[in-house]
């Protein structure tokens, strides 16, 4: 579930601001295009994100965690035409044939070793999958930090994360955050020039 968030998600007072930033990256990846998200698009998405997390933040139990479909529904309630356009772009991932991430998380993330294999996702979902996996690992880093534990993160085929502008930018940002929060990220690639 790309909407998963724990209350330690950010060291700021509001974990929602950082989660909203992630959802903006996700929407930018989904919508694509040269210009990416316009300022009005970002405002509409941010407002919808704040609205869908309201119940969860008031009573943070797993059953109240929003899913992508909740964001889609909230976007459809917004008056701006941009909201309808963004919702239309998300529809494929909510009720269309690529709806694999529109469900509650069914992976046990508290195990000592967790392996995310995105090989079978296919071309259309791979970039989105890479972004969501990094966010899930960030959730784990924040939980482990609160428990005074380090989190080791090994990224094989790291060059794939650097191919797309959105996943590359998020990878650099999250790498820095991981280190600051006691994470130990390790990138693995077959050719060092991929990183230069």
Feature roles, as predicted:
Residues 195-196:
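Short, glycine/polar-rich helix-capping loops at beta-to-alpha or helix-loop-helix junctions
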Residues 2-183, 187:
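P-loop NTPase motor domains
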């Amino acid at each position: 579930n790309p909407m998963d968030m724990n209350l330690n998600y950010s060291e700021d007072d509001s974990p929602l601001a950082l989660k909203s930033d992630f959802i903006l990256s996700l929407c930018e990846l989904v919508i694509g295009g040269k210009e990416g998200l316009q300022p009005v698009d970002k405002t509409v998405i941010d407002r919808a994100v704040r609205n869908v997390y309201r119940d969860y933040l008031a009573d943070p139990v797993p059953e109240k965690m929003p899913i992508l479909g909740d964001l889609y529904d909230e976007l459809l309630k917004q008056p701006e035409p941009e909201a309808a356009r963004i919702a239309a772009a998300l529809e494929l991932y909510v009720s269309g044939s690529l709806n694999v991430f529109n469900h509650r998380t069914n992976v046990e993330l508290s195990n000592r070793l967790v392996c995310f294999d995105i090989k079978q996702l296919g071309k259309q979902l791979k970039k989105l999958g890479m972004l969501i996996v990094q966010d899930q690992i960030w959730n784990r880093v924040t939980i482990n930090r609160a428990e005074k534990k380090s989190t080791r993160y090994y990224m094989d085929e790291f060059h794939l994360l650097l191919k797309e502008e959105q996943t590359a930018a998020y990878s650099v940002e999250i790498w820095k955050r991981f280190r600051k929060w006691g994470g130990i990220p390790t990138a693995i690639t077959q050719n060092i020039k991929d990183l230069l």
